[in-house]
From Swiss-Prot:
PANTHER family noted in UniProt: ADENYLOSUCCINATE SYNTHETASE
Amino-acid positions noted as binding substrate in the UniProt annotation, renumbered to this chain: V299, N300, T301, G302, R303, K304, R305
GO cellular component: cytoplasm
Name of this protein: Adenylosuccinate synthetase
Residues that, per the record, bind Mg(2+): D13, G40
Family that this chain belongs to: Belongs to the adenylosuccinate synthetase family.
UniProt gene name: purA
Transcription regulation is among the record's keywords: no
Cited Gene3D superfamilies: Adenylosuccinate Synthetase, subunit A, domain 1, Adenylosuccinate Synthetase, subunit A, domain 2, Adenylosuccinate Synthetase, subunit A, domain 3
Record: active site: D13, H41
Function recorded in the entry: Plays an important role in the de novo pathway of purine nucleotide biosynthesis. Catalyzes the first committed step in the biosynthesis of AMP from IMP.
Length: 430
């Protein structure tokens, strides 16, 4: 028995929600360890669709304990709204099955406003954020001026913390020519929301340590993807947190030895939202077709995703930077019916072949993909639940991906339905 870390092995939107839900049946605890409510995921269970952003995927199963770790940035109003929406759908959610790290950093309205100001200031400098305040909240965390969940329980120190925060933000707002934030109004808003979120507050590192010692199975749920990691991604077109597997330790307060098996999720093709390099992007009818078949639109934002062929170079790199033991390959069925499929097996930069994605923004923009043509398949893979259900060429495609990325496929997903999953290696039993 081991714990399992789930991370995206591309630029996010790989289908982590379904895989986490599938694994959560075997877990006792599901933990979010980074990001915020910028990374939406959709679960389809018994014909019911649940759209989550901030909450762990395990929350739709009331018998599981869901946890939001200290590595997350936490919008209290978004949290309340998401909890209420689930309750309306008949899901039992409360402090008995959902906990939030008491030292989690809060996202406030001023963070969202600053995010939007920056994104809309100039198209040339836009990163393509969701404008939900994620980056500015992480900035305040690192700048040691953030307001954390535990601060809402201390009316003696909260006013001082607000003044310190606003000394920074009101200076920025004056520079942008917008109204300053009134400290009294912010204090009243926080006092109003506090009773709705404080019952969920807990010492998460301590809670998880006790659960681990009791032999409970813990599933760590990453948001976004490893290629959006602030250090190892396509900087500056990245998110503001670490998204690689190692963040599961720092984002929950557990030691690295507690993490266990690392499962990387990737699509059978590649997608990306927002700005930034994309070596295998298809700006043609094939890219449009993949996007239509795969319903490639953001859960939270509705933004259209850019689509391209599978990039083995990128996934191989994330296998290494996250220490991935096995892959969950999703949306294989979207490639049904293609005569041929292209797979990126290498890069060319300024006329020379290279074996990794360079760190520099300029070099990333000049990358040229080297393709290998793979024979497609006509028979459907949709709803397949065993290798015997798959066409021979589809199996060959999966095996070729394993060879190119240097990592075995542990799970194969052939539709949004959780039952349409082919298990090769159970991560909890690895």
């Amino acid at each position: 028995m081991t714990n399992v870390v789930v991370v995206g092995a591309q630029w996010g939107d790989e289908g982590k929600g379904k895989i986490v839900d599938w694994l959560s049946e075997q877990a006792d605890i599901v933990v979010r360890f980074q990001g915020g409510h910028n990374a939406g995921h959709t679960l389809v269970i018994d014909g019911n669709t649940y759209k989550l952003a901030l909450l762990p995927s395990g929350v739709v199963r009331s018998s599981k304990l869901s946890v939001i770790g200290n590595g997350v940035v936490f919008d209290p109003q978004a949290f309340v709204n998401e909890v209420e929406k689930l309750k309306e759908q008949g899901v039992k959610v409360g402090p008995d099955n959902l906990r939030v790290a008491e030292n989690v950093t809060l996202i406030l309205p001023l963070h969202r406003e600053l995010d939007s100001l920056r994104e809309n200031a100039s198209a040339a400098t836009a990163i393509g954020t969701t404008q939900r305040g994620i980056g500015p909240a992480y900035e305040d965390k690192v700048g040691r001026r953030a307001i954390r969940l535990m601060d809402l329980a201390d009316p003696q120190t909260l006013p001082h913390k607000i003044e310190r925060l606003l000394a920074h933000h009101n200076a920025l707002r004056r520079g942008h020519g917008i109204a300053e934030v009134d400290s009294g109004a912010l204090l009243r808003d926080l006092a109003a929301i506090a009773p709705r979120v404080l019952p969920y507050a807990d010492s998460v590192w301590n809670l998880l340590d006790h659960k681990r010692r009791e032999g409970k199975r813990i599933l760590f749920e990453g948001a976004q993807g490893a290629l959006l990691d602030v250090d190892h991604g396509t900087y500056p077109y990245v998110t503001s947190s670490n998204t690689v597997a190692a963040q599961a330790a720092t984002g929950t307060g557990m030691g690295p030895s507690a993490l266990g098996y690392v499962l990387g999720i990737c699509k059978a093709y590649t997608t990306r939202v927002g700005q930034g390099p994309f070596p295998t992007e298809l700006n043609d009818e094939i890219g449009e077709l993949i996007g239509q078949r795969g319903k490639e639109f953001g859960v939270n934002t509705g933004r259209k995703r850019r689509c391209g062929w599978f990039d083995a170079m990128l996934v191989r790199q994330t296998v290494r930077t996250s220490g991935i033991h096995g892959l969950a390959l999703t949306k294989l069925d979207i490639l049904d019916g293609f005569d041929t499929i292209q797979v990126c097996t290498g890069y060319r930069l300024d006329g020379k072949e290279i074996d990794h994605l360079p760190a520099g923004e300029g070099a990333q923009a000049r990358i040229e993909p080297v393709y290998e043509t793979v024979e497609g398949w006509k028979e459907p893979t949709a709803n397949a639940r065993s290798w015997a259900d798959l066409p021979a060429q589809a199996i060959k495609y999966v095996r070729r991906i394993e060879e190119l990325v240097g990592c075995p496929v542990a799970l194969l997903s052939t539709s949004p339905e959780r039952e349409d999953t082919i298990l090769v290696q159970n991560p909890f039993e690895a």
